[in-house]
Amino acid sequence: MTLVEVKDDKLEIKPVRLRKEKYKTQLKNKIFNEDDLYLFHEGRNYNAYNFMGAHFTSENRKRGVRFTLWAPRAKNIFLVGDFSNWETKEENKLERINETGLWSIFIPRLKEGIKYKYYIEQEDGKAVLKADPYGIYSEVRPNTASILCEKTKIRWSDKKWLNKREETNYFESPINIYELHLGSWKRKDEDEFLSYDELSIILPKYIKEMGYTHVEFMPLNEHPLDASWGYQVTGYYSITSRYGDIKGLKRLINALHKEDIGVILDWVPGHFCKDEQGLYMFDGTPTYEYEEKWKADNKGWGTFNFDLGKPEVKSFLISNAFYFINEFHIDGLRVDAVSNMLYLNYGRNHGEWVPNIYGGNENLEAIQFIKELNEAIKTYSKGVITIAEESTSWPNVTNDTEYGGLGFDFKWNMGWMNDTLEYNELDPIYRKYHHNKLTFPMMYNHSEKFILPISHDEVVHGKKSLIDKMQGDYWNKLANLRAYMAYMYGHPGKKLMFMGCEFGQFIEWREYEELEWKLIDKFDMHRKTHNFFKDLNNFYKNNSELWELDYDQDGFQWIDADNNEQSIYIFIRKSKNIEKYKIFVCNFTPMVYYDFNIGVPEKGVYREIFNTDKEEYGGSGQVIKGNLFSRKGWCHNQQYTLTIKVPPMAVSVFERIIEENKTEEKIVKEDKYI
């Protein structure tokens, strides 16, 4: 058997048996075999966590732990920990097991809970203590040792959910994501986090009651600094011990699944923390990072970029994705900072980067890595979704790899977010001059499969909270928030909302304290806002017109996109059932319009089914309680006209009444409209 591979931009045919020779090992054990090592060094072992790191096993009739580590340029490696009083001992020296940098040792009689690190002697004579890159649990910060874990299994009861997930077409399903930071959603007190187990009691119930379909956890990989929010990782396989243990997180996810709530994990495969105990210069030389200093150094975030072309790094990262999918039943990955991975010149000035072999700024190995990641997940984990946080106009992010795409399922629509936030920050007087801020996103809407995000990044660093971005006094801010959200839920694309926005928290998000839940109890308007979001979420979930044809051009139609003078937008959302559609009338000024004509596509009886101006939401109560009757006559290029009342700073949603065996005359007789 032979393989064809690219080497120095030339095709080279090399027999597999010769390539395997350098990975050969004489070490006999139950944890890995030569095929495992071969695939690992080829960048195609997607379950490397099954043999890398620390694994309880029996060898020569002795129970203990086998440790396996990749450190290609280390001189010597010792395992140190509680069991050795943190001293290097000859009997705890790892053996180099092949030519390509794998080291391993079996140590008998080790027990769960023991803390350990690798003492790595470097070629220059220096030594450093490193946590286990594949370690699955760690000390609570500021301590940094890895911890042996054996009993990590739970009794899952989410088989029904997993079966449903595998059969679901998520492009034609409702996806409404609640993004949250576990350490600051709720707390016991100012200095004590809720544990995974404590969260499993209250979080699923809250998410279900509010009508969200998914939660998205900000990174739960181990990280030393709370203020990094989890985005500067030292332990990719180690779930953060801030909130409890491995079984606790599994129980939390299981509890969410039992309530039919999907779980998405924020994941950072592009760059890593430079703290000494982590992956940084692991064996004294660039190991997980690029060899070239300019390429490795991420000055913007003070981190190092992964060398995504290195096979062992690819095995490490793709296996990490499957570790959370397989072991924790994660339903999706939101891949952070994809733009940083795709572009060689991302965050770099002229002269600070080197073009690729074709003279471009594309990071070719990163592109290949992303494609392989998405292909692998689609192949081996049907129903698990991947989401790109990608902020540029890179094409085909959500197209299949076989057609030249990156293979993501969804992409955050950062353009929509920026334009619509800028619009809603304007005084309504000036909105007519920026009318296209809300219409332009539809010009490129079908270029990708978008998610509309209002994320944590928009409510920090002086940007103000979502409610505080809105223009006007207290009442108008809340009215504007309701209108903006209803417009968002009517716009094509799946939805994402950061915690705290759902009740109008005025202060920016702070990772060191819990949300201002007291607002709901103390202030009637915030309680009403909270109820509004609950109703809006369920309205979205229960009406297929709002999600079934998100990525089909037939799912959206403008009725009036050009009324800039009144800052009114009117559009239709459709479903596969041609008789079902919803008409959205969005008014972004505080003016009420009576006897306002809109065009509708069909003759019939219409009804207002949702109105953000309801008194129960804190609005002025300009609602329509009865039936409305269209009449023949062109309006907005539609054959029929409907006369309505348009509430101030609000969104109204209408539908045509379809009732079997009921004529229009009968509906007229029963009409109670006043």
From Swiss-Prot:
Q: Which organism is it from?
A: Clostridium perfringens (strain 13 / Type A)
Show the CDD domains listed in the entry: AmyAc_Glg_BE, E_set_GBE_prok_N
Q: How does it assemble?
A: Monomer.
Could you tell me which pathway this protein works in?
Glycan biosynthesis; glycogen biosynthesis
Catalysed reactions listed for this entry: Transfers a segment of a (1->4)-alpha-D-glucan chain to a primary hydroxy group in a similar glucan chain
Annotated GO biological processes are: glycogen biosynthetic process
Taxonomy of origin reads: Bacteria, Bacillati, Bacillota, Clostridia, Eubacteriales
Question: Which InterPro entries does the UniProt record give?
Answer: A-amylase/branching_C, Branching_enzy, GlgB, GlgB_N_E_set_prok, Glyco_hydro_13_cat_dom, Glyco_hydro_13_N, Glyco_hydro_b, Glycoside_hydrolase_SF
State which gene encodes it: glgB1
What EC number(s) does this enzyme carry? 2.4.1.18
Q: Coiled-coil stretches, from where to where? A: none
What is the name of this protein? 1,4-alpha-glucan branching enzyme GlgB 1
Any one Gene Ontology cellular component term annotated for this protein: cytosol
